[in-house]
């Protein structure tokens, strides 16, 4: 009651946020006459002035915001013929403040993004606009690029298939558009490279995520994985697959469709053991066979052809469950993809080993500032707040929404439902009203298509099998009499304009734009052909604009676009997205969902409550029921699924957070090693755990730093080895064992006498003694190898080469070990232990051991290094680049099925710190004034890995 009164008096949080931004809109309106008076050439000049003020004179972006927004509004009019509405200015301010702007379909999100993009580009640190597919990235970069170029800013686009040089150029632009996976994979690929100069991505400063719910929530259940071929044989997949058909459901195994898992019964285990000639499937040596059996059962009984995947040209291609699009290049992990290939009788590809992985949550949380926009985020506001620490602000529409949403209609069987919805589509088509039919899978879209064909209703189908003309089909879905069947949210990001999209129709009529001279064609002839194409396009556009305007009026009179949902999705948000395709910009529209008790959502999550409601309403075969109670019960089922999926994502994040700390530590070390002598600043971020504030550090590492770092590694190894052989009780000291370990690690013979005095001092003396001997060996090796023509000790270059080799090999093995730990950790729950805590603890111990192996390998190999002939710096560089090419050729980038993790927050504004003083030597006094040596004071806390 108290909260209700407060809301009445103070307004909701959303209302207060909108009220706070109203003065900005008024200020931009005041500046509009001044901007209108500018000449075209004044726009880039003003932007350049603001850039200088922000970078050199300390002017903040918030100070510049009113002027910048007013400039962009006028630039939109001149470059695009589009003026930002007041509500779009509010949306731009929300994005700039690092929040999510919920804006309904057709409200111009693409144009809204130009406001914070231009403003944040003034910092010179880059702006990334993240889209759901390559088509939208290209379209938006080209379309909005006209506005950016008008303001003197450069635009790049990141899509599949670009070379590293092209990617570097795109990321070097003021504003970079790109597909979400490409950004994540570029980050992982960069951290597998062997020269800092080859990195493409640069700083993660500010990201605006378009369709933010799709990217940060729907796709967050599956991490990005870069993998390479492993030595596993595919023979076992085929052998197991051959015996799976003999397994009987509910007798030999049970299926939990909700969690997509399968559990074998005792009878099933016994049957499998006989069929595979195995004594005990649960014996340690047969765990791999058991895993293959479980994955084969899932492939046969959970993963369905034309729903979860399609088989195309002898290849199993995953279907995106949220968009219905095919995802070529992506493979399920953990042997599941191979099991599906065996089931479908296609070639079984070799299983891959993970080389690098990151979740979307942890990738996007690395940005200094993160914002997003979508038509449907409010239902997931809690998850955005908990996982990303981002608020959702609902932006009012420019014109009132007049769409009519009918209550759900429910039938007993799927057949009755399809029959009824096809009758409705036929009737609407008869009047000329356009209809968009939303389905949840490829198979269901083809069922509806077949039924409409039988009735003689012309229609277009848009699913994973027919996606080539996606944008064109969706853009024309608003034409008179059009019937379009679409899986889920295919075509999202393309507006459905009543009467048709004149621009798309003109391009289709005229044909593609000439992009290169034909064979033997002179440049002048090519330019003339291009000019002729532009002229014909303009003529077609003029003609079609008049035609579509007249058709628009007719369609409006018929009631606008009618949406027919064939099934409720497991998320309310996806249903809202489908409904949101109708009623854009104040246009009329309507929507209705046809459901049946056989639908997946009702069957798995609907429980007996909905069945009971139907019984009480006295439902008969072929009869439909509409009731608000029923709609509420279905919404309750959806909330259950949303909560279940949130738990999965939270789980993924909690596990990935463990890996995230380790990944960042290893990548930081790797960048430092690459930085030795590179002359390129290495940028790192230090986060205050309390305030979440990030401080930006720039540091240039010299070849001298490399030598110091190697001695730090020697000291770490010596302290560890002495500590292991010399515990607190002198009686337990194993000096012979210490001698053997030193011989094995450093290749030097040392004899030790029993200690005299206190154990702690004796241990320190031993450490000093061993360190001095190894340091002499190291200096001798440096002298022995001499210097290259540039005056750099040859040992330095070999240190870098061997260090990178050790890091990459050990990290790859560590990822495999962590995978195995993750797969088996759930069993700890049976021993009354928390699996997550156990994973954190053991994962940390494994990481410490891995870093020890890296140090041991580097120093051991360095001290044993014998050069048959002196290699030049160029030869070493060539060897390093060959290593990089070989590694990158063998990798596969994919989404993998996984489980995962928790609370994440984007960082506040960063500060830059550039080191002004020289690097402090290991044995120099610590600058803090403690009187201790640097290596024993602050040097200990700053030591890498």
From Swiss-Prot:
The keyword 4Fe-4S does not apply. GO terms for cellular component: cell envelope Sec protein transport complex; cytosol; plasma membrane. It catalyses: ATP + H2O + cellular proteinSide 1 = ADP + phosphate + cellular proteinSide 2. Keywords: ATP-binding, Cell inner membrane, Cell membrane, Cytoplasm, Membrane, Metal-binding, Nucleotide-binding, Protein transport, Translocase, Translocation, Transport, Zinc. It is found in: Cell inner membrane; Cytoplasm. Its EC number is 7.4.2.8. SMART domains: SecA_DEAD, SecA_PP_bind. Residues 892-945 are annotated as: Disordered. It comes from the Bacteria. It is a peripheral membrane protein. This is Protein translocase subunit SecA. The gene is secA.
